Amino acid sequence: MTPEEFVRAYGQALGTQSWSNVEPLIHEDACVTFSNGTVHKGKSQVKIAFEKNFSLIKDETYSMSNLHWVMSGPETAVYLFDFQWSGVINDKPASGMGRGTSVLFREGGRWKLIAEHLGLKAN
């Protein structure tokens, strides 16, 4: 799997809203920061955060666009992206967008997400 293939697989896994599909793509030491500023350190905390979002946002669609590869080497890769999501929260339509930065680490021949920072888009 290349870093580009990882991004496609990660986007598809997120779209299923199932941790069991996302989990193989997450590094044990992952650190994820959501656009609301919450930080989740370690795979177990990332799992809790993702599962909370999956249960809160019904019928979610999530997409990434405008990928920019900052660097891609044999063991690490870094990319920037725009993200958009929409779904239903408490029976009401909801949506959001922002910018993200992700760091991938190759471990045991497989790319895994080790860091992701999601933020709001500047006006």
Which residue ranges define each predicted feature?
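Generic hydrophobic alpha-helical segments
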Residues: 9-10
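A solvent-exposed, acidic/Ser-Thr-rich amphipathic alpha-helical stretch
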Residues: 6, 19-73, 81
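Short beta-strand segments enriched in hydrophobic/aromatic residues
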Residues: 26, 83-85, 117-120
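A short, structured loop/turn motif at beta-sheet edges
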Residues: 69-76, 92, 104-112
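Short, cysteine-centered beta-strand-loop-beta hairpins and adjacent loop/turn segments enriched
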Residues: 85-95
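C-terminal and inter-domain tail/linker signature
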Residues: 29-30, 43-44, 90, 110-115
